Amino acid sequence: MGDVKLVASSHISKTSLSVDPSRVDSMPLTEAPAFILPPRNLCIKEGATAKFEGRVRGYPEPQVTWHRNGQPITSGGRFLLDCGIRGTFSLVIHAVHEEDRGKYTCEATNGSGARQVTVELTVEGSFAKQLGQPVVSKTLGDRFSAPAVETRPSIWGECPPKFATKLGRVVVKEGQMGRFSCKITGRPQPQVTWLKGNVPLQPSARVSVSEKNGMQVLEIHGVNQDDVGVYTCLVVNGSGKASMSAELSIQGLDSANRSFVRETKATNSDVRKEVTNVISKESKLDSLEAAAKSKNCSSPQRGGSPPWAANSQPQPPRESKLESCKDSPRTAPQTPVLQKTSSSITLQAARVQPEPRAPGLGVLSPSGEERKRPAPPRPATFPTRQPGLGSQDVVSKAANRRIPMEGQRDSAFPKFESKPQSQEVKENQTVKFRCEVSGIPKPEVAWFLEGTPVRRQEGSIEVYEDAGSHYLCLLKARTRDSGTYSCTASNAQGQLSCSWTLQVERLAVMEVAPSFSSVLKDCAVIEGQDFVLQCSVRGTPVPRITWLLNGQPIQYARSTCEAGVAELHIQDALPEDHGTYTCLAENALGQVSCSAWVTVHEKKSSRKSEYLLPVAPSKPTAPIFLQGLSDLKVMDGSQVTMTVQVSGNPPPEVIWLHNGNEIQESEDFHFEQRGTQHSLCIQEVFPEDTGTYTCEAWNSAGEVRTQAVLTVQEPHDGTQPWFISKPRSVTASLGQSVLISCAIAGDPFPTVHWLRDGKALCKDTGHFEVLQNEDVFTLVLKKVQPWHAGQYEILLKNRVGECSCQVSLMLQNSSARALPRGREPASCEDLCGGGVGADGGGSDRYGSLRPGWPARGQGWLEEEDGEDVRGVLKRRVETRQHTEEAIRQQEVEQLDFRDLLGKKVSTKTLSEDDLKEIPAEQMDFRANLQRQVKPKTVSEEERKVHSPQQVDFRSVLAKKGTSKTPVPEKVPPPKPATPDFRSVLGGKKKLPAENGSSSAETLNAKAVESSKPLSNAQPSGPLKPVGNAKPAETLKPMGNAKPAETLKPMGNAKPDENLKSASKEELKKDVKNDVNCKRGHAGTTDNEKRSESQGTAPAFKQKLQDVHVAEGKKLLLQCQVSSDPPATIIWTLNGKTLKTTKFIILSQEGSLCSVSIEKALPEDRGLYKCVAKNDAGQAECSCQVTVDDAPASENTKAPEMKSRRPKSSLPPVLGTESDATVKKKPAPKTPPKAAMPPQIIQFPEDQKVRAGESVELFGKVTGTQPITCTWMKFRKQIQESEHMKVENSENGSKLTILAARQEHCGCYTLLVENKLGSRQAQVNLTVVDKPDPPAGTPCASDIRSSSLTLSWYGSSYDGGSAVQSYSIEIWDSANKTWKELATCRSTSFNVQDLLPDHEYKFRVRAINVYGTSEPSQESELTTVGEKPEEPKDEVEVSDDDEKEPEVDYRTVTINTEQKVSDFYDIEERLGSGKFGQVFRLVEKKTRKVWAGKFFKAYSAKEKENIRQEISIMNCLHHPKLVQCVDAFEEKANIVMVLEIVSGGELFERIIDEDFELTERECIKYMRQISEGVEYIHKQGIVHLDLKPENIMCVNKTGTRIKLIDFGLARRLENAGSLKVLFGTPEFVAPEVINYEPIGYATDMWSIGVICYILVSGLSPFMGDNDNETLANVTSATWDFDDEAFDEISDDAKDFISNLLKKDMKNRLDCTQCLQHPWLMKDTKNMEAKKLSKDRMKKYMARRKWQKTGNAVRAIGRLSSMAMISGLSGRKSSTGSPTSPLNAEKLESEEDVSQAFLEAVAEEKPHVKPYFSKTIRDLEVVEGSAARFDCKIEGYPDPEVVWFKDDQSIRESRHFQIDYDEDGNCSLIISDVCGDDDAKYTCKAVNSLGEATCTAELIVETMEEGEGEGEEEEE
């Protein structure tokens, strides 16, 4: 490989990169330098400071040097060189001179190579001379207007090409297929050309170009390294052109070469190729098209004109040029070049003379008036993303401008080189503000305080200039000097101002609590009027003022507080402005509030037109940010939205800046405006997007700015925290208890921090408590006091990121009082500034901020507001959608479709099945409407109307996939009824419906309805549509039909009359009667006028009432309407028409109309309207429905992760979130009775009954007959039997269980069905009883002269209630009767005072709250005193703890030839676990007793795991470790023969009644544990599952223990860096959870946890669930604060402290543990103070309860040995009922073995998830349903999450996920729409791993050709 040199140069900069070939071979060890953030060219004013900065990477660390004219630059004088951490570097040139201009070369070198980048410094004035053009420097404060638009093309004319979807980067493996796809629009149909680099691609065997479903597709089969490069899709038509590029790269390609693309295989030693890299603004074909058509790439001479510059093409009209400019994508990236041959390639960018432009373009407003703030025009720059190596942004600063030469060189806009800073000072201090201003001519500087000029005053204020700086000096600051100061610099070019604040703190003054000297007064106003609320407040310090409306913070009004007078100004009052206004005043001593009621009377409709245009307030006001920017931290590749809310009169104009440079709208940066809200959307952030973002707003009255820092972080594995359900703001009274709840998610599970007013809550106060139920966290404030009020913040953190949410707690009727000093007062600061939305959701520290209420003047118009006379030109930057739609709104004829659509459509009633059979006649016009509207790219979450409290921020933070054109969720094919306008209105981004407000997306086929605002919407007039649509779009004919044409019939319907146009006056006819009810005349034709006199218009006798309903409860709305003829009823929710579905039942019985929803969801909240229509007119009434959140205990986990559920949960049939328009039926003669799906109107609650009692379960049903009722249990239909009876009737069904037994427990489901649908309900039945007898045979051990220890098993079933105690009964040979001996709680008892000449038998009964069980089996006859010689278990040979018995260590090989039954007698079962079962074995030869661990191993992987465990145990021959002595394998069965230990688990032994726990015993146990683990570590092995269950006592009397269960053990030696992701949450170390390398110290953490619990009975990290436990472990926070540690020695605490270190390097090892002073203590002579065992008992009870959860548990556990009994060598003479076989009944040993193996219950082994059935690609028709089915295997049961492209799917009525007990998983998508066309992925995860499968859903919409030919021609 030869040297590679890449050079890119222009008239501004030159960049070159070199690669040293000698370093390539050593790439894995070293890395050549690479500029990951290269420095940029600068254009600086003379005298200013220039700073080149960038970032370089490489290994070793590269050295950065700077050169100019071949000479190195050294740091000193005006030049400052700096190299920072992580490769950052900079060159700073102070006081730039003319001679400093020129090119600077930055070189980064290390041992692996060198890189260079050349940049250019242009000093203002020199640049113009160099190019022969005047230059306009880009400064922070200057302005320019959008170009003027004098003429516009016809609305039906040509449209330049556009990209509707983005071309994404493709990364494939070599040999795979690479696929690029994008969607384009334009008229006429654009011609598509694909290029690689600049060379057009020709179809071949490997390269195919096609169009699929409107997508342009390029496929490259068998990708190799020659195919790597940048591919461009070029689209051209007669109206313009557009192009978009993306890179194809091969996965695994050497990282040093990945930044280049091999473009040619040159054989020359030197090849020089020059290409142009300039954007042409011409709308006709330029060089790129010419290259595509001629397939040649000409090479112009350097410095000359490009080849197309000489073409004498006619100058295109200015408007075409403007549209082309607007529509053009961002600058095509420079083509990177990959060189692998022995040659040198230079890529040179040619210089292009800028195109002349008409002077003054864009300076005038539409009315021709000059702008009030003139500013020199500035060229638009198009930031180009080039994350590749050494990329540059090359921008022609003077392109496309023709500026007169005169006066430009000698003038410059004012600029602040340095600005005054905000200060806080004490009274009487001297304050000095300094600023430095530049500009030509020299600007004049003026100072202002709160808008009032500040002038020099002798002895107090000095204003002067010194050494080029301007100063304002306050000699003695007073409190009255506090406020906002501003400085204005102005010259002939314009003016610029900046502002800051001064806070002068009063010296020690007597503090006074707030109080009102005058309070608010009630008032009444007429809609549209302004009003002011005023009160006087006093207090020291000055109280903070917060205004509330109906208890919620006000976001849109202007408030002032001057001289103790607080005022709230409401302009242009709306009906929703009425309510209770509260002024809340607070300071450090307390808070006080006063309230007033404001009534807003509606205007008469005759004056409706008066407020169609906003009334401009008379007094200009400077801009104010109601919501500013806040700092953001996001992941690389995330989508970010920054939103501000700004008010002012006239409406301010806004620009966005990044690090002081103005941001231009491009493919990556979008600007959006919704009324007073302005947003900057970054589609995909890169590290170079890090920096300070500033939003600057100005109008004629002043300007203001806000800024924040965006930090782009490298991605981590996992998911950033987010709120499943957000908390709500709370208003409470003194003394009440308050709950603030939220549900959270994240991976790893986040830690939760609660803060008030920015400070962490202190747990020591005792006034609050934080509760957790799985992922639901609740803050409980008991008996709230005034100091509890304030802003509460919930901060979530994990290693991926953090998220926060704020809510406010406000107190009602607080009396002013002084608080004790030191008490922290509440703070309600930020409430007005948008800190908390009206829904209480709070502001999230993410890029996307949800609006609360609509801003003032906004209504529901997103892009039309505020444009009045200023029009499009006044707007700072237009969004991309302002092309033909913006023109169309001005010229299209306004048409009223109500005449045709509202009546005279004869239809026939069709069922859904009928509709699906006639798709050819059912024409869906939405497909055509959708193509006319080209919406912006929005996230999937923004398209959905979701609850204010449930927002999924992953759509912001996750890496986005290919952008798709959003389409609202659609409905089945339209029936012959009112057409659906949602596809027009839904094309624009919707406002989320919040606080009961509505997106109001549809007009209900009546444009007039849009004039009535919904909820908080501002009246916007009948001609203004809702959402983001233009008026012309709203009223545009459907399907591209001509406006004057007859509407195409839908279904079999034929319209009776032609579409008639309506005047604007007719559209405005709309009469309001009262607030909640509206009646109007629908007709404008003669026929309709005649029909009015033939009947009575509808009227509501009973109106709808506002409703509050809890989530999951039934919602019922009813109203009564009278009319003649009978009216047709239409229901709408938030403007969307409802229809009967499986979830929503609409009914009409006579005059009673109702809506019924069985289980209300958050999406059911909003404004419901009932519209009644007949020929005589129409009426409507409405109500607001609020769906309150379910209680915290009912909140579920993150909805997108779905766990397998039992068969009892039947999937409900899906409904739709966005339902179709209701059919319009002919006016019936008699009121029809609507057919209804079945409803279950009565059903029992969960029941608990005693065994033997009878149970009746009755469900009452209603609906259209016939209805079939079916009872099921666990998804299987219940068959009648002697115990169960089913009785069905017309109105219900009853299930009777005559005598309930334990097997009748479970979940019962009643399924009711008719032809219209189905419904189901479930009830849980619990049968309680006395417990079963204790299992097995009681066993006597430790037999002495007059005592013994009796032990037994617990009951196999506790009867539905926990066993409370055991009753022990005794039989002796003298009395020969059974009598009760004692009662105890544990499963062992020490029996005393036995006589040596008697024989005894024992039996045990279990007792719970329902009674006493039958007795257990009888023990064997036992005598005390001298025991006969008999074989003994070696573990019982000696109780002397100091002497270990002899152990027969064996190296085990697995016997595959013989069976376990050949050598051992298999006796009773001792226990079972997930691995299999444990049986007692007696060796035939020696009669020794062993334990047999029987595994079921079905796969090779499972067998290998068991073999690995045996192999590890062969290395672990130590007295403290349980020994494996034999092993057998036969087919799927593996048996390990193990040493038996009978003392039970260590902690079970400790809580025995007869055990005395002291610190001495703890030392003995910990010493043995350390010895055993030390030996394990010396063999190079880690245990990884140390926990109490795996520490077994040798017997029930001594203190010797053994460690068991090596199923998770791993060899560390030779393993390199080992990472695992398993263990028991409570005992696992932080590095395991974080998936970091583990070591021997990982076991030491577990030892520390065991020791902590052993000495205290408390667990340091146990939470209420595993997620909380894992979070506690990750944070590694613990203490000895509990009183349990009062009795523990300091040595013991020190021992624990040195083990529970988060950094594993700082933990003790086993050798150090054994040498620790605590374990070195003399246990024989030390003081033994008894420790309490109560906490240990509670801990064990809690741990047993927790084991029923879904913890990440270890495999292969031998903890069941805790219940081993019957340790004597004799076989039971009677046999054991629990034994798997009875040897006497079997004929041969072979039968014995076979019968045993069959008896071992097949328990599932642990298996990584896999798909036994995968999802398949689907192709469906729009409007139908799609279903993906798969089957998932794995154990533990995998959890499932579905993805649409890269977005996780949350279950809703549109997406339903079903996952049953058998592993069948389905995703059902109802009412499929074009937006559902995507790739779907099912991901299954359990503790062993994950699996995914993917399929594509293709949605067929109408053919592209249909409707296209019907465009209007003028």
From Swiss-Prot:
Region of interest: 6 X 12 AA approximate tandem repeats: 999-1063
Any one Gene Ontology cellular component term annotated for this protein: stress fiber
Effect listed in the UniProt record for changing V1213M: In AAT7; uncertain significance
Sequence repeats: 868-895, 896-923, 924-951, 952-979, 980-998, 999-1003, 1004-1015, 1016-1027, 1028-1039, 1040-1051, 1052-1063
Reaction it catalyzes: L-seryl-[myosin light chain] + ATP = O-phospho-L-seryl-[myosin light chain] + ADP + H(+); L-threonyl-[myosin light chain] + ATP = O-phospho-L-threonyl-[myosin light chain] + ADP + H(+)
Disorder association: Aortic aneurysm, familial thoracic 7: A disease characterized by permanent dilation of the thoracic aorta usually due to degenerative changes in the aortic wall. It is primarily associated with a characteristic histologic appearance known as 'medial necrosis' or 'Erdheim cystic medial necrosis' in which there is degeneration and fragmentation of elastic fibers, loss of smooth muscle cells, and an accumulation of basophilic ground substance.
Protein name: Myosin light chain kinase, smooth muscle
Gene that this sequence comes from: MYLK
